[in-house]
Amino acid sequence: MKKTVASLLCGLLFSAPVLADINVGISLSTTGPAASLGISERNTVEFLPTEIGGEKVNYIVLDDATDTTAAARNARKFVNENNVDIIIGSTAVPPSSAIAPIAVESKTPQIALAPFAAEGAEFPWVFTVPQTNELMAAALLEHMQKNGIKKLGYIGFADVWGDNWHEALSELGPDAGVTLTGDERFSRNDASVGGQVLKVIGTKPDAVLVGATGTPAALPHTELRRMGFKGPIYHTHGAANQSFLRIGGDALNGAILPIGPVVIWDKLPDDHPSKAIASEYVKAYEGKHGEGSLSPFGAYLFDAGQIISAAIPVALEKAKPGTEAFRVALRDALENVQEVVGTHGVFNLSDTDHFGHDERARMLVEVQDKAWVLIED
C-alpha cells in the first residue's frame, strides 16, 4: 500500500502534462508545527476529482513544512515549472500569506486552506475555504454573553493567526459585553508557556480564549489548568482535530470551540445541506485511514475540490488551460460560485466575499472525554 501511494504521488509530481490538462499546485504543511492539520489534507488529495468539464486534472503536491519561505518557493515552482492554472494552499495562515504575492504577480488564482483574509491587491486573486475568524468568533462571543462572561483573557500565536483572532475579539467583543484583559503570545514551536499563562491568570479573567491551531493549542490549555485556572477555556476552529484531543487529554474536558458541520456529520439534522456530502467524505476518508481519523482540515481540501469543480467548466467556455486567459477566466468564475455545497457549509462567493460562508458553516461543541459534544441552542 505504501508503495502504491508513493507511486501515485510521484506520478502527480513528475508526469508531463498534456496541453489541455488542468494543472493544480497544492502546497501543504505536512511537516512542521501545522503537520497535524496538513497530513489529513495530503491524505485527501486522492478524493479530489480527476476530471472536470471533460478535462483531466493533474495535482502537483508539495510540502512547505509550515514555513513561509518554503511556501513561496513552492508557489514559484508551480508557476514557473508546472504552469499551474490554480494554487491551493497552504494549511496555515503564514504560509498561505506567503503564496499570495506570487499568485497576484503571476495572475494565478489561489484557494487558501487557512482563513487568510487577503487585502488590497491580493484580494482579487485569493479565495479561502475555511470559515472566517469573525464568523466563528461571533459564535463564541454569543456563548460568552449567555453565560455571563465579561472579562476574557487571551493567549494566541505570535503570528498572523494570533493577530487576526485578537482583532476579531477586540472588534466584536464590546457588542457582546466582553472585554479583553490582555494579549499574551507564544510561538508555534514553543515547549513552555508558563510565563504567559501566569500573566493571563493575573488579569483575573472570567474565561480565556486560546488563539492557536492544532496540537500547539493544547499547551496553553493544559498549563492554565495546571496552574489552577477554573474558568471556561475557549478555542478557535483551528484546534479541532484528533491530535489536539490526544495531546490535551482529560485536561481539555469542558473546552468550547466552534467547528464546521463535517466534524459532527452524524449528528446533523437530515435537512442540513452538508449532511449528505459530509457523510460521503467521512466514509471514504475513514474507510481508507481508519475509524476516527477524520479531520476538518482534510475536509477543507475536499471542499476546495467542490469549488473548482463548479468554476472550471465556466472558465473552459472562455479559454484553454495553461494560459493566462484561462487563469483570469477561472478567477472570474470563482467569484461567481453560488450555492456550492461542501462538508463545511454552503459557498456563495462574490466580488466582495471570497470566503462565502454563512451561519450554516458553524456549530459549537464542548470537549468531553476526548470527543466533540454538540452544544444545543
Regions found by a protein language model. Give the residues of each.
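Extracytosolic ligand-binding ectodomains
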Residues: 4-10, 20-377
